[in-house]
Amino acid sequence: MNRNEITTLLNFVDKTRLLFNKKITNNTVDSEWRIFSYVIKNHLDNKIITTTSIIQSSGLPFATGLRRVNKLIKEKKLIQRVKTKSGKSFSIHPSSELIEEFTLYLLSIKNEIASNLGFGELNDSYYFGMSLSAGNIIPSPKVFINSSNRFKKISLLSNDNPTFKVINSNLDFFEYILDCKIEHIIENDLNKLLNLIIKNSEKKTKSKFDIVGFNLPWVGQLAKLNTLLPLDKYIDSSGFNLRDFHFSAIRSSSYNNKLFGVPIETIPDLLFYRKDIFEKYGLSPPKKFDELLAACEILKKSNEVESPISWPARKGQPLATSFILMMANFGKPYVNLRHIGQNTYDLDTQKIVIKTNFLSEAAFKAAKVLKSLIPYSPTDLSLQSNDECVEYYSKGKSAMVMNWSSRAHQFELNKNSPAFKNSGYLPRPAGVEPFQVSPIGGFSLGIPSNILDDKIPFVMKTIQSLVSPEIIKYYIEHGSLSSPVFSVANDPEVRTLSPIFNELDKMERDERFVEWARYPLPSYSKIIEQVGNELFEFLFLNKDLQTTLEQCQKSASRLLVWLI
């Protein structure tokens, strides 16, 4: 079990014990469980806890709570660690024995539930919280009963990512399923799409759109501008099973612990590689960037392909994204988030002063690696964005490409592509351990804040249909290789369409997907555009790296003023 699944199980047991104590025993204290749950949760988040905070969490009077904590320390369930040089202040932590016992306890609960749902005990395909349809063949989409007499039309604003292309190409089908007319407005340019979403909510009149598909890193900016409606209370009353969604997808759609969108397309940035070519030259799939560069050198000498690798390097947002994702593989987000441990950073920025990391060692290394890739990349690399570099790979012109998973449809569903059924998938290679990770991208469906109040239930039901397992499967069958939910990825029919789903499911369970690489600062889009322009001059116009990164840091610092 990974950290996310343990946390979900803990929350589940918390609720069941609370229900038992309230409904059966009328005892709401349950102090020992509350202590253990509190200690384990904070340990997972690498947060310091004290004797006082544990007593407060226990629900016991202070003196009784103090005796209980001392007893648990004596029993070696908890351990003390000196916090200050004076030795008079301590932090409290779970002992290794408690962590092991607690993990085994939660695992036994998971296995019991899995067994009763028809999964074999210790079956790794069961992920706690996934839909009951997981592992089964998901049926065709069912029709939505629109009982509203007032609302017979939905207006959707989005870009042209693969999932939205499926909707637009099959409007008659979706109108039949949703029992309403659909007005689908597509804006291909991401900057223009962002501005459209913002301007729509600036108006004092009602919103022009009912649903907006927003790029995940925009959530901070859209939340700060009150552009989107917080969805938490509507989710609770609409019957959404958010636990079936990948944790990374839900977190990436949230800001300051509020949910502003429901994931419709969750896509990690991966390394695609040609298995047949790698096998031909005895190359191992690269897990580190030095291994990738070594493979590039061998492939360049072989003349097997035009270029060993392709990746997005167009000036502005595409290049900046490649840069900050590379920074993540060298162990740093582009802003100074708190490091929890391993490959995890805390997304809570309430207690820190935000600064950018463009003068960090990771930034220098990331820029240098991108520069070192240029001799192994297409001659028109500086013109390539996401679609162009995947198309290059799909035509057999490169042996590797770094890009978002959804674009795998260009070769996985194209029998004429040399990469068809010949592609392997990996998290992005590590610059330093343990950062072989893939940052999460994609789109979520949000509701404009100036929508008519009485239309919200109808719109929520529409969103629920658009992200249901049946509809997600329909997107996949029609060309969008993306699933934000566990249950669809476990459908045997879906798995036969492309090996990418098995690989993505495994990466999610192994916690290879991270949200912190593109932390959604309210000024994210402006910072990224500036950084992409500056990096372009270093990579293609030979500007000095130190000067380039100093300029990135300076321009980003000016844009951070908006946060204050």
Task: Please place each PLM-identified region on the residue numbering.
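Glycine-centered hinge/linker elements that transmit conformational signals in sensory
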Residues: C296-I298, R338-L383
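C-terminal capping/gating helix-and-loop segments adjacent to ligand/active sites or protein-protein/ligand interfaces
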Residues: T163, S438-P439, V488, N502-A556
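N-terminal leader segment of winged-helix/HTH proteins
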Residues: M1-N26
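Conserved N-terminal structural module of periplasmic/extracytoplasmic solute-binding proteins
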Residues: L117-G220, T547, S555-I564
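Extracytoplasmic/periplasmic substrate-recognition and gating elements
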Residues: Y281, P375, L413-S483, V514-A517
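Short, Lys/Arg-rich nucleic-acid/phosphate-binding segment
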Residues: V82-S91
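Hinge/lid segment of periplasmic solute-binding proteins
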Residues: L216-D269, L426
